[in-house]
Amino acid sequence: MRPVPGTCIFTRADLRDCGWSDAAVSRAIRSGRLLRHRRGLLSLPGRPGPQPATAAAVRACSGGVASHRSALLIHGLPVVGAPPPLPELTVAPRGVGGLHRAALYRASLPARDVTVVDDIPVTSIARTLVDVARHRPVTAAVAAIDAALHGRLVTMGELDDVMLRCWNWPRIRRAQRALRLVDARSESPLESVSRLVLSWLRLPTPDLQPVVLDESGRAVGRLDFYWDEFGVLGEADGRSKYDARAVLTAEKERQEQFEDLGLVVVRWGWEHATRRHNALRARLLSGFERGRLRDRSGFPRLWTL
């Protein structure tokens, strides 16, 4: 196959500059080696993520910038819940009108709030997170912000700067509430969502990410959640029964190590964190009761981050 431009999305003219003829482009489209988007825009098939559709929407929308959930995906941050059905763009308040196959938000976009990823204009990480916190459920916002803070992709100072500049925008109080709930120690979206759900269920507040040490002082592993008063550890497990056997075996061996140290292990997944809250509460309360009945004199030592 002939060389193609290094950008995510390109035109026939771009391909001609790379030595393609119009006939060759047409043949590649018919055979599926090139994908055709709106207004004559093209991309390679199989590119991971939503970039081709988003790039096509941005290119078709003068002054449009990828934002909100589309920006999360471009920045490699988690989207809790369904992915956006359409590319999400932000345009100037008096910018372009309705655009087919794109969801438009109208807002000011100073230069500091815009960056470029894979040749796509996109809102900065800090601006993206504040926008998501204003418009999406708190679970989605906190999971994305936790991931960015944990990965050191953004700082609280950068988020506060955007918040101050947007202090009078719609739904800014919603974003403020989300920012008060974030915790950079969470290592996965499921942990972030679970942390919120545990609070809503009025369960005791757990320690996050403590390291378990055995009698010799050797680190056995780090826990997602730990309730020291009960000797109970909580594992937010996003894996499924279809994951590789080696991974599942390693998880089982890890659980047995903790149980050998006298800990009660309670596991849950996305189903409990998103829909079966009462079942999660019952599972943890049962674990707390079992922990109360155990001899706690030999409990392992913990080192908290």
Model-assigned labels for residue ranges:
Residues 6, 19, 112, 149-305:
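Surface segments flanking catalytic/ligand-binding clefts of nucleic-acid enzymes
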Residues 1-173, 207, 288-305:
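Short gly/ser-rich loop at a beta-strand->alpha-helix junction or flexible surface loop bordering the NTP-binding
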